[in-house]
Amino acid sequence: MHFRAITRIVGLLVILFSGTMILPGLVALIYRDGAGRAFTQTFFVALAIGSLLWWPNRRQKGELKSREGFLIVVLFWTVLGSVGSLPFIFSEQPNLSITDAFFESFSGLTTTGATTLVGLDSLPHAILFYRQMLQWFGGMGIIVLAVAILPILGVGGMQLYRAEMPGPLKDNKMRPRIAETAKTLWLIYVLLTVACALALWFAGMPAFDAIGHSFATIAIGGFSTHDASVGYFDSPTINTIIAIFLLISGCNYGLHFSLLSGRSLKVYWRDPEFRMFIGVQLTLVIICTLVLWFHDVYNSALTTLNQAFFQVVSMATTAGFTTDSIARWPLFLPVLLLCSAFIGGCAGSTGGGLKVIRILLLFKQGNRELKRLVHPNAVYSIKLEIGRAHV
């Protein structure tokens, strides 16, 4: 185990992360909300920590193995979550304890969406932007972003990429070089974010909120800039836009890459995981709409459909946005949506949960075992195409 080489890479990653403090710092300058000092302090502290880790080990360049790649990922998320808590600690508003600051930082980076903050509407814009930015970086994975940058600094990225990517997609290289794959993933990620922000802005959401919610939507994180979450805007159009982009982000990014490469939309429907993912969403929307309509929870059929569509997609993709309290819903529905969150999104997406592909493989495995009960000597193989990868 090359511990000094590992320390060098972690130091480089922390130095890169320190540069992200510039963005919320600029927001603080634009809105003059008084939070700029917290990000300035964090920038220098993170830069110092990264430099202390990197400088003594700057000449330690060794070939990374799989176990070292996994260790770097674990160390980096631990260190990054800790450094990411500093703006919450240094900021006068909100006045968080160290424990709450750590919780907020790790919740953002892991796109969990749980929060210790209340009174979001009165917080500085820079702090609100920083929370959304944490989720956005955590959504695709800063490690994947770093893989696109570190080769410039002489660090190989394959083992880091394999350790960071979830599920079967980790062995599917869309480009011959791993750095090119990482850049392609982030290009798609950025394009979706820009498209989502513009759509929300055109739908009537203020520019700051549109950018913030596009970050959390594409990352499937669930943080909002308001205590009432998406319900603050009271707009069926905004609800629909966010739900659509949550579905897009819940898909395998390998499929988005195929479309970007000039292939037709048919590539989506040919993917069995995508078909199951959409099938689950449609089934849940139909069930929720019918039950809500039968119990007269909302005044009109259109409102019922809109609320059902949004809440189903938000819960099933593990985003956690809300537009209304589901405590008003029949108890059967919240339990159903909670179960759907265990499935989550597709492999290679920003969604959480077990991943649809694993549920699909579980069904196929079960079907194979039933066949083997009837024909014990037969040989049955499980074949499944995921985007451009094969299992």
Task: Annotate each predicted stretch with a short phrase.
Residues 1-390:
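Membrane-proximal intracellular helices of multi-pass ion channels
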